[in-house]
């Protein structure tokens, strides 16, 4: 593998926090690996977490859920956004597949945009999904089972199931509709002891 394409959701920074340690460790074993990261997150923040060279394409690959604030979901706006996002779904996946073909990756790692996975499948590019959650289950929680959402309820898990494997990081959602999951323990950046800096910032003495 020479070129890894990494698609990261920017719905909060937790997706980056899960993905960055994997990339940092992978680069230690494969220092010649070319990494392309596509995410709507700021480049400066990505560089704080991803400590190896990478090329950043600043684009939004999904939107997760529309939010009032950090914890409250704007359900009507979210459902409307999903209907718009999935309109003409087949064409959109084909367009994304063309973009991916131009990038020529050997593997896609997605945390956890799903259109990317569907496009990779169409283009014949191996793919791995990795996260503690997926938008299929979250959408199902909020969206009614009606004619307007039936296609979306099918397309979301189909996209995730198209990956070779979905690495389900603990603690995770159940993901009963996904048939390619493999459970892993949690992934996180290892901390560094900075006792003196902490004392200085807090104005605390060493005693």
Locate predicted features.
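Short, polar loop motifs at secondary-structure junctions
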Residues: 39-44, 112-115, 168-174
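A nucleotide-sugar donor-handling region in carbohydrate enzymes
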Residues: 139-207
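Structural motif
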Residues: 3, 106-107, 165
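N-terminal subdomain of nucleotide-sugar transferases
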Residues: 1-52
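Conserved nucleotide-sugar donor-interacting segment of glycosyltransferase catalytic cores
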Residues: 96-157
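Conserved nucleotide-sugar phosphate-binding/catalytic loop shared by glycosyltransferases and other
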Residues: 33-87
